[in-house]
Design a protein with these regions (language model features):
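An acidic, glycine-rich "communication" segment
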Residues: 43, 125-201, 207-218
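Bacterial N-terminal signal peptides
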Residues: 4-15
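Aromatic-Pro/Gly-enriched surface loop or interdomain linker
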Residues: 16-87, 91-94, 192-193, 199-229
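Extracytoplasmic/secreted envelope proteins and their assembly/folding machinery
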Residues: 50-57, 103, 107, 125, ...
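Alpha-helical scaffolding within the catalytic cores
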Residues: 71-77, 99-105, 169-173
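Surface-exposed patches in mature extracellular/periplasmic domains of secreted proteins
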Residues: 66-76, 118-121, 139-147
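Loop/turn elements at helix/coil->beta-strand transitions in domains of secreted/extracellular proteins
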Residues: 31-33, 83-87, 112-115, 139, ...
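Short alpha-beta junction capping motif
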Residues: 35, 87-126
């Protein structure tokens, strides 16, 4: 674990918070450091894995100096609570659908500092790709290079995102959308990363997989709160 990196991230976040107070309304004002769970329409189980985010937040409190809340917040794309979180998580096994207004609001939030992590729980791939292409038709998803900070910021993942659950023999992949040099959307695919955050007895994961999933989550969150400009 790179302890100095955590201190750098905290300093960066504090400088961002100071800057937010000095800037205009277009800069998102993150009220607290927590994770927003996206309540989306379309029929998919957006609520899947109820123990996942509390466990990740607990790991962040234990392993970093970041002032992280104990619980996630359920948010919608058109509600004011979206602007209170720096990191938005979405998962599920079914269909995802955004309204035209939700598409506009999500793009605006991401352009102004937000970070979306979509975790395909083996079922939402087709609909997520369709909907995120509506949000950024001019910025297609690309595979995130292994040199990117999300794989090295706190813990090293030289081979990229870890494979947590095996379903069809395909490798785990991390895709993303960049605005300039900033990664604003991260899509964990063919891995079940969020399932790895859940209580180990839920999926009977071995300790090393649970730990790998939490470590990757720590990297993602610390990147999200340190790359808001």
């Amino acid at each position: 674990m790179r302890v100095p990196a955590i201190l750098v991230v905290l300093a960066l976040w504090l400088s961002v918070a100071d800057g937010i107070r000095e800037r205009d309304f277009r800069v998102p004002r993150f009220a607290s450091l927590t994770i927003g769970r996206l309540h989306y329409d379309g029929g998919g189980d957006w609520y899947a894995g109820p123990s996942a985010l509390p466990n990740l937040l607990a790991a962040l409190r234990q392993r970093t100096a970041l002032p992280v809340a104990e619980r996630e917040r359920v948010v919608t794309l058109t509600g004011p609570e979206l602007w209170d979180v720096p990191y938005l998580f979405m998962t599920g096994h079914g269909n995802v659908r955004f309204s035209d207004d939700e598409v506009k609001q999500l793009r605006r939030w991401l352009e102004q500092g937000g970070f979306l992590h979509a975790d395909d729980d083996y079922g939402m791939d087709k609909s997520f790709r369709r909907e995120i292409a509506r949000v950024f038709p001019d910025h297609p998803m690309v595979e995130v290079p292994l040199s990117h900070p999300i794989y090295h910021l706190v813990y090293d993942f030289p081979r990229g995102i870890p494979k947590i659950h095996e379903h069809d023999g395909l490798p785990a992949q991390g895709f993303g959308i960049f605005l300039g040099n900033r990664l604003v959307v991260y899509y964990s695919y063919q891995t079940d990363l969020g399932d790895g955050w859940e209580d180990p007895e839920v999926h009977h994961d071995p300790p090393e997989l649970h730990e790998a999933a939490l470590r990757m989550g720590v990297n993602l969150f610390t990147y999200a709160v340190s790359a808001t400009r």
